[in-house]
From Swiss-Prot:
Its main location: secreted. It comes from Sistrurus catenatus edwardsii (Desert massasauga). Expressed by the venom gland. Residues 1-23 form the signal peptide. It comes from the Eukaryota. Disulfide bonds join C25-C36, C53-C149, C125-C141. Belongs to the snaclec family. Shows greater sequence similarity to the alpha than beta subunits compared to other heterodimer snaclecs. This is Snaclec 3. Interferes with one step of hemostasis (modulation of platelet aggregation, or coagulation cascade, for example). It is found in: Secreted. Heterodimer; disulfide-linked. One of its GO terms (molecular function) is toxin activity.
Amino acid sequence: MGRLVFVSFSLLVVFLSLSGTAADCPSGWSSYEGHCYKPFNEPKNWDDAERFCLEQAKGGHLVSIESSEEADFVAQLVANNVRRGISYIWIGLRVQGEEKQCSTKWSDGSSVNYENWIEALSKTCLGLEQDTNHKWVNIYCGEINPFVCKA
């Protein structure tokens, strides 16, 4: 009997610790490597999308992408959740300054350590282009596009 109680308790602890990881994300968000992600189909310009992400979850911002594995996760999330026929999806990176130099920080303040550019910088905001396997492209910041938030 004591052994059954111990096994039951052990299974409960494992279940609660595993479910706690997913419970850290708001309802409807996906979890990857300790962060929460959610694509939004309602198109917004870059600034409005960033503000919206700030309001959605504690620590929320437009998505920062820090590795090729995270890029693959975000690409799959977009492919499964953003309407077909949409060309661009906002990410949390934009050109800062007069010289059109890319900011060295994402909108969440993290450093840019991974890059997936398809073209040289010419406009001020960046997004994923669905037709190029989610490579990063320059987009006019006032354009309205769906976006992905990360918290």
